[in-house]
Amino acid sequence: MAVTWLRLEARRRWRSLVVVALLVALTVGTVLTAVAGARRGESAFDRLWAVTLPATITVVPNQPGFDWSAIESLPEVSATTLFVVQDGELITGTGPDGSFSSDNLGFPPGGPGALHTVERPVVLAGRMSVDSRADEVVASAEFMSEHHLRVGAPLTIHLPSPAQAEQSFDPTSAQPKGPLAQVRIVGVVRSPFWLDGPGSGGGVLPTYAFTQKYSQYLFGSDLARTSVYVNALMRLNGGEAAIPAFKADLARVTHRSDIDVWDNYQKFGGPVKKATSYEAAVLLAFGLAALLAALFLVGQTVSRYVADSAEDLRVLQALGLTRRKAVVCAGIVLGLAAVAGAVIGVAAALTASRWMPIGLAAYAEPHPGFSADWLVLAVGGAVAVLLVAGGTALLT
């Protein structure tokens, strides 16, 4: 009987069934995109943190010639990478829109292992640079987007002269007088410390071989007079919990209490997580509003469909059709329409995941592009079908 009823309804009222399927598809696609996008955005920084060997702390004595050997050997320290703090270079290149210049050269590595043992970034495109190659750099996604570049693009780094480097040369106020270093972008990367932000312009990270090759143009030729200094990123045994013990040992071995130690998760992750939590709440609110509106629209459509079918079902009941079978007949037709709509909606949500997450979370997402949150998609699709089928049963 149910199969016969399905054939009759599909032939007579296919337009109404298509409307139900489309409404369900629109509802499922919109709500699941919002919910999955909210979950993905809120977890973006933590997922980036989990896969990049992030530095627990940044140690910033800001002192030229600082001796790191005693600090690196402290029992709390698991791994260290040093970075040079200076900003005397100018980067030029050519993109689709013509020539461009930028002063966003990231902190050059001050020792081996940078981008490998600490703050090992996820590679969004291309590959990681090779430490021994002075002509290779990696760039942030924002830098690539800002200048419309692709992996393999050549850049020229205008270095200051040794005398300029010693005096913290500003490339925006005068022309660098050092050599021109020809480099090529081999990859696009992202990590918590090297995180982009809105309007930041992104940056380029050279290798340790670059630092070694052009050392006198970064530090100057007289290290006793230079104003350039090296700070450190460190991973601690025990993570954040080990920071107080590290600070105590740092003060003991340096005989200084004025050295800043940043808790990287709080300093870099705190503002990002605050923003992404707000963005997730907005997306969830949008999804809830869409759901409430859809419940009204779908409910009205299902109610009209059931009312139109009631007369035919009453005739069949007079001929011996039980109430239970009548409910099954009505439910199976709308249930199949809901299944079709749910499948389309889930497919739409999967497609929309390419543009998620949005806002600040997009800058922290370790795996941008297509992403399937199967928990949300499966549960959401199933609930949509059950609501339509259950509503039909109650109204019949």
Positions of PLM-derived features:
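N-terminal low-complexity Pro/Gly-rich stretches
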Residues: 313, 395-396
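Membrane transport/envelope proteins' first extracytoplasmic loop
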Residues: 1-295, 299-308, 323-324, 329, ...
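Conserved G/P- and acidic residue-centered "switch" motifs that form tight phosphate/ATP-binding loops
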Residues: 152, 320, 345
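Hydrophobic alpha-helical membrane-insertion segments
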Residues: 334-347
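C-terminal TM-helix exit segments that contain a strictly Trp-centered aromatic cap at the helix terminus
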Residues: 344-354, 395
